[in-house]
Amino acid sequence: MKIEKMNFYSPKKYKWKGIKITEQAIEQILFLINKNPKNKGIRIGTKKSGCAGFRYTMELVKNNTIEKENKNDIVFYYNNILVYISLKEAPFLNGIKIDFVKDSINEVFKYCNPRIKTFCGCGESFSID
């Protein structure tokens, strides 16, 4: 990977608070990345969904897509995890906490954002102030 291609987010522009990833989520993300040597990191984003507007997304970034990444991405390391965030989605992700929760047979990443204004009835989508 070429470090000179990394883009750095301007904290003053959006009063960037960063993201927080819990130890449980870090362990699960590293487990998923290490399942395939082509996996190099994660992309965190949002997608239009549901009746309230958006839902959070997380996908693995493969080695062959690193060179194709948009120059409008924020790229940084978080506890040895290479993280990509689109600059246009950064305001939606500002200040989020990502956790990994095991509840009986269900295992899921949970996203906590103090700026969420409303949830849809099923809790899948949200809107932000």
Swiss-Prot record:
Belongs to the HesB/IscA family. GO terms for biological process: iron-sulfur cluster assembly. It comes from the Bacteria. Gene3D superfamilies: HesB-like domain. Disulfide bonds: none annotated. GO terms for cellular component: cytosol. This is Uncharacterized protein BUsg_114. NCBIfam families: iron-sulfur cluster assembly accessory protein. GO terms for molecular function: 2 iron, 2 sulfur cluster binding.
